[in-house]
Structure formats: C-alpha cells, structure tokens
C-alpha cells in the first residue's frame, strides 16, 4: 500500500490504495532506508538486531537532520526479542541520539511486524498524537538464542530449543512448523512442486536482474563491519536453475512439495521509514517519497496463513471502488512460493505487476523487518 508517482501498490498484510475525499490528515513517507539482507549466520552473524536497527535510524536522521528534533514516537517491529534486552525500539531510539523524552514501542505481529509499525505510526499522526514518527523493523535470526525450561522439583533443565523455531516459525495453535501451512495451501489449492519451483526461479531471476541494474542502490545503506563494507543482499542466487531446484528434497513433509528452494530463507536485516503528516511536510517544504492513502488489516485461519493478502486486497478494492486493473504494482511477501502462487491466481495479478524485484525467496525474509523492507523497496 503506497501510492508513488500516481501509481498504486499492494503489499502482503496491509494494503494502501488511493482514494479521494475526507478531512483526515494524510501521512507521507519522507525517507526510507534498509540494510542489505544477510544470510543466516552470514555477513551479519555477529551484529545484533538492535545494532542493525540503530545503523539504519542513525543514517535516516543524518540524511534528514531537521527531523531529529521533530520525531515524537519510535515504533519498530521485532519478532525474536529474547536476548535483545528491554524494548529494542527504545534502545534503537536512544542509541540513535534521539531524546529520552520520545516514547518507543516494540511490536510483534510476526511477519507483519514491520508493516504494523508503519500502520501504528500512521494512526498516531492521523490522531494528532505526533507529526513525525520513525517506524521500522529489525531481526537477527542468526543471534536468536536457545532456551531451556527449568524444573525446580528435579533441579534440571530441559533440552535447549531454538527461539527462532518456537517463537518465529511454529504455529502456536497447531504446534506445526510454518512450512506445513504452505503444504496445506498447496494441497487445498492443488499447487504442484513444478509451479512452486518455477515461481522461485523467477523470484531469483528478478532479484538478480534488479541487483545487477542497481535498482537497490538508493534503498540500501552500506554497512561496515571490521573494515569490510557490505552493500548487497547476500542471498540472491543468480545461478539458480529449474533443474537445481528440482533436485532439492522436501523439508516439512515426505510426500510434500515445499523445499528450501521454493521457500523464503532465514535472514538478518533492518529497515526504517520516516513518516510525517502531509501538512507538516508541506509547511517545512520537505520532499516526500509517497503518500499513504489507506491501510487495512485482516485475520485468517492460521493453518493457511500465507494467503491472507487475498482477503486484504479484495477488501480494499471493494472499499475504494477499484479493480485489479487499476493497480500498477503489487508487492506480496514471498514466505512460501505455494502461498504466493495462490494469491496471484485468486486475484489474477499479471506476472509483470508482481514483485518485480524479487521477494522473500530471493532477497530473504528477516521476519520482523520484512514488512518495512517491502515498503522501502516500493
């Protein structure tokens, strides 16, 4: 959901479309920035989620110095918070040089966390609680700890279990891995392994082409670690072929269709956006990247969670009297190819309008940061 240069966009969980009328304060995106996305235990293995977020916000404030004293709230999404210390958003705010007086909130809505942070920022501005808000998302899947449960009666600890799996990648209701929700979708909508591998191949090809043409340069903040500068998404695989994808074993179900190649990857990264009321931007003659026109949020059966964009997009189209043809580009998070294929099919989205620079399968999916990353790329 962001309108840029009179074009319309939809994203995975929240959607923003243009509509006319109304006296509600419009909200604009002044600036947006992200780190490169690192592989699991890759280039950002030794960098915490808080540090990644701080790196982005410091750069945003440096690029927009007049806004440093105007920020009135900080809202960041972060899923794997264990071990990060109290309120990562507050740490990011103070580490970035913002005033102690500015409140900060950390949001956990799993993969929707980064988008929810932006939605809450918009609400705060529209309610008159703030004129400028810093929002974003952070995640270090590499640094997510293992936890043991202590039994006082036996004075013993349980076998350590990864927080990443427990809190980030397992359905709390069924106790099953997120990958099995994709298998559910594939079975329910008859999505084949060949279809999923083909979708994954196209994602890799689009991301590789976008990277080669420099499409990500303006949105990526180069990050220096131990005198090495990282400025590209680490997980893009331009050498991917359909044949290679076909050799991969299924991960979650013996006779299933979901593999490591047609699912999103484990990643580290951060993204941030500076939002302001349109009247504030115009009063101070601040250029802006986009106008947020509308947001909606939906719930869905968690056993098929990945197809929620269908409901969200249909809801917004109906509410704003628009059709699919009226939308120029769609950005839908690629948690799993199976889910993305169903969304595209059910909404009849043309290939040339969908995730034109790749998505979670190719770029990576640092869960708490992905929502903001999508907005930043748009």
Each predicted region: which residue ranges?
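Conserved beta-strand-centric core segments of catalytic alpha/beta enzyme folds
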Residues: 6, 16-56, 113, 117-155, ...
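N-terminal extracellular/periplasmic Venus flytrap/periplasmic-binding protein-like
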Residues: 34-35, 46-55, 63, 195-283, ...
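Conserved beta-ketoacyl condensing-enzyme motif
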Residues: 45-112, 116-133, 138-157, 220-232, ...
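Short, well-ordered amphipathic alpha-helical segments that serve as non-catalytic structural scaffolds
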Residues: 49-65, 88-92, 117-120, 178-185, ...
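Conserved catalytic cysteine-centered active-site region
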Residues: 78-131, 173-177, 239-265, 346-378
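Active-site-proximal alpha-helical scaffold in enzymes
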Residues: 107-139, 186-215, 273-279, 344, ...
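A glycine/threonine-rich phosphate-anchoring loop and its flanking beta-alpha core
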Residues: 159-194
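Glycine- and Gly-Pro-enriched alpha-helical subdomains that act as flexible
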Residues: 278-326
């Amino acid at each position: 959901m962001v309108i840029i240069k009179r074009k319309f966009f939809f994203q995975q969980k929240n959607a923003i479309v243009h509509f006319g009328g109304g006296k509600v304060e419009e909200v604009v995106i002044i600036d947006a920035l992200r780190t490169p996305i690192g592989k699991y235990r890759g280039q950002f293995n030794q960098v915490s989620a808080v540090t990644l977020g701080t790196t982005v916000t410091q750069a945003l404030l440096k690029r927009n110095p007049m806004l440093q004293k105007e920020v009135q709230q900080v809202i960041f999404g972060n899923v794997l918070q264990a071990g990060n210390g109290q309120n990562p958003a507050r740490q990011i705010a103070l580490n970035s040089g913002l005033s102690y007086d500015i409140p900060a909130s950390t949001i956990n809505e799993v993969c929707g966390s980064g988008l929810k942070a932006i939605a809450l920022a918009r609400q705060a501005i529209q309610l008159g609680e703030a004129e400028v808000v810093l929002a974003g998302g952070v995640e270090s899947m590499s640094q997510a700890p293992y936890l043991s449960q202590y039994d006082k009666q036996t004075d013993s600890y349980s076998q350590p279990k990864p927080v990443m799996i427990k809190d980030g990648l397992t359905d709390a209701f069924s106790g099953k891995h997120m990958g099995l929700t994709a298998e559910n979708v594939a079975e329910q909508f008859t999505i084949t392994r060949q279809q999923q591998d083909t979708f994954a191949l196209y994602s890799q090809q689009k991301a590789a082409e976008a990277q080669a043409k420099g499409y990500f340069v303006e949105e990526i903040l180069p990050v220096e670690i131990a005198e090495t500068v990282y400025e590209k998404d680490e997980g893009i695989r331009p050498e991917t072929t359909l044949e290679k994808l076909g050799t991969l074993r299924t991960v979650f179900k013996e006779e299933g269709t979901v593999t490591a190649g047609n699912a999103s990857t484990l990643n580290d990264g951060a993204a941030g956006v500076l939002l302001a009321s349109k009247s504030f931007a115009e009063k101070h003659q601040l250029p802006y990247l986009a106008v947020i026109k509308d947001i909606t949020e939906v719930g869905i059966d968690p056993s098929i969670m990945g197809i929620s964009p269908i409901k969200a997009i249909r809801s917004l189209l109906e509410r704003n009297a628009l059709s699919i043809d009226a939308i120029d580009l769609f950005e839908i998070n690629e948690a799993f190819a199976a889910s993305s294929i169903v969304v595209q099919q059910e909404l009849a989205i043309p290939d040339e309008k969908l995730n034109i620079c790749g998505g979670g399968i190719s770029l990576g999916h640092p869960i708490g940061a992905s929502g903001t990353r999508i907005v930043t790329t748009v």
